[in-house]
Amino acid sequence: MPDMKLFAGNAIPELAQRIADRLYISLGDATVSRFSDGEVAVQINENVRGSDVFIIQSTCAPTNDNLMELVVMIDAMRRASAGRITAVIPYFGYARQDRRVRSARVPITAKVVADFLSNVGVDRVLTIDLHAEQIQGFFDVPVDNIFGTPVLLEDMKARNLEDPVVVSPDLGGVVRARATAKALGDIDIAIVDKRRPRANVSEVMNLIGDVEGRDCVIVDDMIDTGGTLCKAAEALKERGAKRVFAYATHAVFSGNAAKNIKNSVLDQVIVTDSITLSKEMAATGKVTQLTLSSMLAEAIRRISNEESISAMFN
């Protein structure tokens, strides 16, 4: 069996170290830096010939820098004769650009990134909760898209929620909400239906479901600016919700996210470490971060040993 080696870029070094600790191995020795003009510089400082190499790197902000680090690291490994290269991308950036809207003259950037990674020589991709599962089909190599839900569910169950109801923040998240509700004992769900009655009129947050006097659990795959999430929480509290918790795998937290969440009626926001939490977000006092290290370490072990990934969720 080829020697397994883990390497990390600069995007999520803490998560990479936690994964290495779980696997009882050290992170590989690589220097990922910048030339004076800003170009990415990579030097692999140990022998990887014939090794089963895993490169851990989310393509979160700064998205283009982190993507280029990953691409250049893959090329360096390929030229150093690595036996197999797996890109471990907990958060896959550009995933929201997965389609053309009608006849709009826009790119499908998720496909561009998939081609970029495939063409540079990656053999396999491991990611978590892709924004759109069909992105797996953009790649010409195998993609394992695993679920972060078990990590979030563990926290939900430990909170002793009172008469809980799972809430989808929009119509597109109903399938996720139903799956979460089933895992929590087939509890009720509610849906926040955001719509604009007519042009130049503020959006109205319509609520479908009973939340009065109950703990609400909003579930989503990611939180960006948090604007819609905070409005959904307000709508729930206005309808008598007791407490409102928000759960998401990916803590994108861009723009005014820190301000929005700090000033919101949300009781707690629970996310994972697929993206490193900024000091500004941590200072809000409302964000709890859970680690994906155990799940990712097990997935990496299974890939290296040619074992089933889907069996992790049976």
UniProtKB/Swiss-Prot annotation:
It comes from Vibrio cholerae serotype O1 (strain ATCC 39315 / El Tor Inaba N16961). Homohexamer. Keywords: ATP-binding, Cytoplasm, Kinase, Magnesium, Metal-binding, Nucleotide biosynthesis, Nucleotide-binding, Transferase. Its EC number is 2.7.6.1. PROSITE patterns: PRPP_SYNTHASE. It catalyses: D-ribose 5-phosphate + ATP = 5-phospho-alpha-D-ribose 1-diphosphate + AMP + H(+). Transmembrane segments: none annotated. The lineage of its organism: Bacteria, Pseudomonadati, Pseudomonadota, Gammaproteobacteria, Vibrionales. Pathway: Metabolic intermediate biosynthesis; 5-phospho-alpha-D-ribose 1-diphosphate biosynthesis; 5-phospho-alpha-D-ribose 1-diphosphate from D-ribose 5-phosphate (route I): step 1/1. Its cofactor is Mg(2+). D-ribose 5-phosphate binds at R196, D220, D224, T225, G226, G227, T228. ATP binds at D37, G38, E39, R96, Q97. Involved in the biosynthesis of the central metabolite phospho-alpha-D-ribosyl-1-pyrophosphate (PRPP) via the transfer of pyrophosphoryl group from ATP to 1-hydroxyl of ribose-5-phosphate (Rib-5-P). Mg(2+) 1 binds at H131. GO terms for molecular function: ATP binding; kinase activity; magnesium ion binding; ribose phosphate diphosphokinase activity. PANTHER family: RIBOSE-PHOSPHATE DIPHOSPHOKINASE FAMILY MEMBER, RIBOSE-PHOSPHATE PYROPHOSPHOKINASE 1, CHLOROPLASTIC. The active site is at K194. This is Ribose-phosphate pyrophosphokinase. It is found in: Cytoplasm. Mg(2+) 2 binds at D170.
